[in-house]
């Protein structure tokens, strides 16, 4: 058995693992990265963020073609099958894998493909798909193994019509009807995608409202547009049983309702990928969802073993995972450490949603004297030109100091638009002010000028 010695070994090549490994390598450390799959990128690249967002982009283009009056003048609406749309999305995955493989090569990071398992606190074995075993020894370890869809034992995921958010990307036909259980971020995004392809979707929500962590006005806007696209949202529901047959799937709800569809997608919760790591050999125990507990420096109970990304739970975002990986490596490199917080949320429904900071409910409960600044996309020249007039920018600010407290955006390019306000919101002291948008000249016509419109709207409310 070959034995290799490194300064740092990172388990997992998703956003968290990639940033931890590259940061350590750029500081002169000998770094190895272990990836279970036969290509780098992790769940984010192969089954999660990248394919689903690429798929969403293709569906959005189809929707624009079918609703744009200019295109209707030259032809009838076009119908595309799910597999055909998905095929184009796979091009992006290949590009991502090639690019990230070059990152590791350029930074002289050693890649090992196989299942990683701790032998002791400083030793890791890697078993490849040919049952070959290699041993990696290191002073520091970073666990960045990500997560996978939570699969309840009473649901038969081997049935050809029952899917989770990973296997749905292997769907070989276009269902006429689809039941999605779980109305969180993933469930809402797929409800938008499939309804955009003309599929009738039942979205089952175990809570009272969609994405309750969002500002109420934004959540209500999402509910409205899902309904407009033919999505039936069922709140406060749970399943009694889910059974598939040759022609479809029958879902019995605890409320007594019975639903039937061509296919079923489970999108309710995720589990950390820790079951194959041999954590018992190093004295670590994950929680019931396979997640590891860490301190404010991303250290586990074993001080030289760090954990970052989805494997530690909230917020389970690729953007946060990337920053966590870099911050963890900064800690053992004795560089400036930053705990990752104030994380923006990007939800890629159609239209998309993005937010950062406090929402109205939180500010009201805290008795903060805030005011609302709004700009509607339909009132901006750029949106009128592109035709993407659905949406709004909402800024919450302190009515006395004009400090920006929260930013919420709904509509096309929301996740891009948000970062302008986020940059000002992160400034210290008086630099964080709504007046910045009044005193700044924006390009015209742009969506960015929505900040100026919103700021003027908000200041008109202050007396």
From Swiss-Prot:
Any Pfam family matching the protein: Pyr_redox_2
Cofactor descriptive note: Binds 1 FAD per subunit.
Keyword Cytoplasm recorded: yes
Family matches, as HAMAP family: SthA
GO molecular function, one term: flavin adenine dinucleotide binding
Keyword NADP found: yes
Function: Conversion of NADPH, generated by peripheral catabolic pathways, to NADH, which can enter the respiratory chain for energy generation.
A GO CC annotation given for this chain: cytosol
Alphabetical UniProt keywords: Cytoplasm, FAD, Flavoprotein, NAD, NADP, Oxidoreductase
Binding site for FAD: 35-44
Catalytic reaction equation(s): NAD(+) + NADPH = NADH + NADP(+)
Enzyme Commission number: 1.6.1.1
Principal subcellular localisation of the protein: cytoplasm
InterPro entries: Class-I_Pyr_Nuc-Dis_Oxidored (IPR050151), FAD/NAD-bd_sf (IPR036188), FAD/NAD-binding_dom (IPR023753), FAD/NAD-linked_Rdtase_dimer_sf (IPR016156), Pyr_nuc-diS_OxRdtase (IPR001100), Pyr_nucl-diS_OxRdtase_dimer (IPR004099), STH_gammaproteobact (IPR022962)
Family statement drawn from the similarity comment of this UniProt entry: Belongs to the class-I pyridine nucleotide-disulfide oxidoreductase family.
Cofactor(s), names only, from the UniProt record: FAD
Localization, UniProt: Cytoplasm
Protein origin, superkingdom: Bacteria
GO biological process: 2-oxoglutarate metabolic process; NADP metabolic process
Protein name: Soluble pyridine nucleotide transhydrogenase
NCBIfam families linked: PRK05249.1
């Amino acid at each position: 058995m070959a034995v290799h010695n490194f300064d740092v070994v990172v388990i997992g090549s998703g956003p968290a693992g990639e940033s931890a490994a590259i940061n350590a390598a750029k500081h002169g450390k000998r770094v190895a990265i272990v990836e279970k799959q036969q290509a780098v990128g992790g769940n984010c690249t192969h089954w999660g963020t990248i394919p689903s967002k690429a798929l969403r982009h293709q569906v959005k283009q189809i929707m624009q073609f079918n609703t744009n009056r200019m295109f209707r003048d030259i032809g009838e609406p076009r119908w595309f099958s799910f597999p055909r749309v998905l095929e184009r999305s796979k091009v992006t995955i290949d590009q991502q894998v090639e690019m990230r493989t070059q990152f590791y090569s350029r930074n002289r990071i050693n890649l090992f493909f196989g299942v990683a398992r701790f032998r002791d606190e400083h030793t890791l074995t890697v078993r490849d798909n040919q049952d070959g075993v290699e041993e990696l020894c290191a002073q520091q370890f970073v666990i960045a193994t990500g997560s996978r869809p939570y699969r309840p034992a009473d649901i038969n995921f081997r049935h050809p019509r029952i899917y989770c958010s990973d296997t749905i990307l292997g769907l070989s036909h276009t269902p006429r009807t689809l039941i999605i259980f779980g109305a969180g971020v993933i469930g809402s995004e797929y409800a938008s995608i499939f309804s955009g392809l003309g599929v009738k979707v039942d979205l089952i929500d175990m809570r009272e409202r969609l994405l309750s962590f969002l500002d109420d006005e934004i959540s209500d806007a999402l509910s409205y547009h899902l309904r407009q696209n033919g999505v039936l949202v069922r709140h406060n529901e749970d399943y009694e049983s889910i059974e598939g047959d040759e022609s479809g799937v029958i879902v019995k709800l605890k409320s007594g309702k019975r639903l039937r569809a061509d296919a079923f997608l489970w999108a309710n919760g995720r589990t950390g990928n820790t079951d194959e790591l041999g954590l018992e050999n190093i004295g670590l125990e994950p929680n019931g969802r396979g997640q590891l507990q860490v301190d404010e420096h991303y250290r586990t109970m074993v001080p030289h073993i760090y954990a970052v990304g989805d494997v530690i739970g909230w917020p389970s975002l690729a953007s946060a995972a990337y920053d966590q990986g870099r911050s963890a490596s900064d800690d053992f490199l004795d560089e400036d450490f930053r705990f990752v917080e104030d994380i923006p949320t990007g939800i890629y429904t159609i239209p998309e949603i993005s937010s950062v900071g406090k929402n109205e409910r939180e500010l009201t409960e805290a008795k903060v004297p805030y005011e609302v600044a709004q700009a509607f996309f339909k009132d901006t020249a750029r949106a009128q030109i592109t035709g993407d007039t659905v949406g709004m920018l909402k800024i919450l600010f302190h009515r006395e100091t004009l400090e920006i407290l929260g930013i919420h955006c709904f509509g096309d390019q929301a996740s891009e638009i948000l970062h302008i306000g986020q940059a000002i919101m992160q400034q210290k002291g008086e630099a964080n002010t709504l007046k910045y948008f009044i005193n700044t000249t924006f390009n015209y016509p742009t969506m960015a000028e929505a900040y100026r419109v919103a700021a003027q709207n908000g200041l008109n409310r202050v007396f």
